[in-house]
Amino acid sequence: TVLLDRKIENQIQFLTEDRGVKHITLRVSPYVASYLCRGLLSLRRRWSWRYHVALKVVADQSLGMVDVKYLDRQGSPLIE
């Protein structure tokens, strides 16, 4: 999960700094979702503060452990 969270953070950085996206929904497996959202200062919250983005994490059982979908506010994919 260390490599996975770095990969996710790099994509968030790319989307916010290069494309100017302000709202991102991450669709991930339930295990990854709980890892990203656990604790008071979770990774999700730290990334939201660091990149000034509204970040929502949604658990999706149909995805594999390392699959991540980046969606905008309307549910359209940000990265193909």
Predicted ranges, named:
Residues 1-80:
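DE-rich acidic low-complexity regions and acidic surface loops
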